[in-house]
């Protein structure tokens, strides 16, 4: 998707960089047409927060994922997200509300989503919506209440 993005929007080559987190970041960086910053695996929470606060979008090109913590973390920092319509990702990213949900395995749509978040959207509103979604749906209290509800339903069906 990054190479498609660079081809469709050549002006992004001069004002867009890609920070890559996780294993194999060096290997991936050498394959991309935009400037890259391979950061490797980071488990220091304060460094992760600093990285989220330094970027304008979080892209998760995963082809299978349930409820990725990385999306919650980035949205909590006000960072709009882009990901494929797979697993729990579309439950977390509200399409064109707090990010962009691309068609499954469609790299061109993923590139469109990245461009839309960075250039065509009301970025401030996306950012506010991301924080709001996380604070409402993924707060410790709400998650705990969801578990309690599941347990209560399980208990009531056994009676």
Model-derived regions: residue spans:
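Nucleotide-activated donor-binding/catalytic signature segment of Leloir-type glycosyltransferases, i.e.
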Residues: 13-16, 22, 26-46
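Short alpha-helical segment that forms part of, or immediately flanks, the ligand-binding pocket
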Residues: 49, 68, 72-76, 90-91
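Short alpha-helical donor nucleotide-sugar binding micro-motif in glycosyltransferases
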Residues: 50-55
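Aromatic "clamp/platform" in nucleotide-sugar-dependent glycosyltransferases that forms part
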Residues: 63
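Short acidic/histidine- and often glycine-rich active-site loop of Leloir-type glycosyltransferases
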Residues: 72, 86-96, 100-101
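Short hydrophobic beta-strand element within catalytic cores of glycosyltransferases
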Residues: 80-83
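Conserved acidic donor-binding segment of nucleotide-sugar-dependent glycosyltransferases
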Residues: 95-96, 100-107, 116-121
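A short, well-ordered alpha-helix in the C-terminal region of glycosyltransferases
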Residues: 122-137, 146-149
């Amino acid at each position: 998707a990054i190479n498609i993005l660079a081809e469709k929007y050549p002006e992004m080559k001069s004002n867009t960089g890609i920070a890559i987190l996780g294993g194999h970041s060096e290997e991936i960086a050498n394959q991309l047409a935009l400037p890259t910053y391979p950061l490797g695996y980071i488990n220091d929470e304060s460094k992760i927060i600093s990285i989220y606060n330094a970027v304008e979008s979080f892209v998760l090109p995963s082809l299978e994922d349930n409820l990725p913590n990385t999306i919650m973390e980035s949205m909590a920092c006000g960072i709009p997200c882009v990901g494929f319509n797979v697993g729990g990702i579309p439950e977390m990213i509200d399409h064109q509300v707090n990010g962009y949900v691309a068609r499954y395995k469609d790299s061109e749509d993923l590139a469109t989503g990245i461009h839309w978040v960075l250039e065509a959207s009301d970025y401030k509103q996306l950012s506010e919506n991301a924080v709001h979604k996380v604070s409402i749906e993924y707060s410790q209290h709400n998650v705990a209440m969801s578990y309690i509800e599941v347990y209560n339903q399980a208990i009531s069906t056994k009676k």
